[in-house]
Amino acid sequence: MAAKEVVFGNDARVKMLAGVNILANAVKVTLGPKGRNVVLDKSFGSPLITKDGVSVAKEIELEDKFENMGAQMVKEVASKANDAAGDGTTTATVLAQAIVTEGLKAVAAGMNPMDLKRGIDKAVAAAVIELKNLSQDCADSKAIAQVGTISANSDESIGQIIATAMEKVGKEGVITVEEGQALENELDVVEGMQFDRGYLSPYFINKPETGSVELDHPFVLLVDKKISNIRELLPILEGLAKTGKPLLIVAEDVEGEALATLVVNNMRGIVKVAAVKAPGFGDRRKAMLQDVAILTGGTVIAEEIGLELEKATLEDLGTAKRVVITKDNTTIIDGNGEQAQIEARVSQIKQQIEESTSDYDKEKLQERMAKLAGGVAVIKVGAATEVEMKEKKARVEDALHATRAAVEEGVVPGGGVALVRVASKIADVEVANEDQKHGVVIALRAMEAPLRQIATNAGEEASVVANTVKNGSGNYGYNAGNDTYGDMLEMGILDPTKVTRSALQFAASIAGLMITTEAMVAELPKADAPDMGGMGGMGGMGGMM
């Protein structure tokens, strides 16, 4: 085991604070509408320009081991805030720096670190309750657009496109962000349930101009096995011929004689039919077939539950308003399943998402839920260059996380005002002694830090702005975008409650622990080995005969 270096007391805290400050100072220049960008060097490709706090924090690694420990702990604050709410990483970093700075001053003045931490924890617990009281629902499209705009660094086009996407696919729908090909942002919405399986034979195509199959008001047959014998399908096909309606078959596979007969019947116009493979594999396929069954009001024909294809009737089939099948995708629009059953299935999938530990499984479950609940929207980010594209895509992703958080827990006045108002309400929180009281004061001072930093980044005097806002009441705050004071909600400056709450909780949690540090241990830097001496030259070779 390598030798370790140990530093104690004030020496340890000074080193740790230096690391905290280096990281936080790099991150906090990005805060607010007039925050600046940070350029990150990449080992390959062009540098990345970003205004996202967590992206900056993740890049920072310091040479001094003890300073680096301080920086890494604040990096953890930003990462945790990002994981919980997807935004608010810069706010969390600013709060953590403020708590650590004030806390270490108090420790140096001889106060008890453990009591300081208890005081900070009590203040934060009270602040979280007050934030909930201050919070308002974010229900309408206008409020969603405002939250998106603020999170995307006051870019209204991003806020608007996210609000439109949410309106189209619902709050449970999936919205993904991709790099587009054009200069402008684009929104693609797939309504209904789409899965990535196309037609099994091009002879099913009935719209040659688009190369697709379109079925109006079709029956949907769902089978969890391969179909190779046409005899199994005859009862269903005979029943269908009488109704004159088209049929979509979704099965593990349709092959051989069965596929050939379906194609012939389709081309002769006896039965209008199309067949596709079931989506997914193994257990996921079974689950997705069941999703389609619930969406269309049908039954999955599976031998393991005692249902045979030969004995299936029209009662077992689902129905939909329309089905569109291309070479690669099948889309079922307006399935006729019962709304109550669909909602029950969605809440069952929600439960599975909460219990799942795998990110991949969560993503797949989220997709399934979206397809049942509303649809899938894709925002294609447009930009002139790759560097701008990456920067813009990161902002769109942040804005998307912020709007989701806003829909979940509501919104509070933005621009750092919510924390200032909360601080004024919890000043008299109950504590056991003077040191705990000072811990509360540290937390209250830290809650002003985001507002002060927004003002500083806008080129204003932080103390003047903070006092003006503190003397106001309710939603009154400072709009750094146009250098005016007024009602933040009316000006459309909103922060998601979840983002503000998460930032405060994670910052206080880690900063509180840092204040209580008394010793730090790190590996000694290895001394460089001496260079190898140069090799002696080779003697000249004699003349050759």
Swiss-Prot record:
It catalyses: ATP + H2O + a folded polypeptide = ADP + phosphate + an unfolded polypeptide. GO terms for molecular function: ATP binding; ATP-dependent protein folding chaperone; isomerase activity; unfolded protein binding. GO terms for biological process: protein refolding. ATP binds at T30, L31, G32, P33, K51, D87, G88, T89, T90, T91, G415, D495. Belongs to the chaperonin (HSP60) family. HAMAP family: CH60 (MF_00600). This is Chaperonin GroEL. It comes from Shewanella sp. (strain ANA-3).
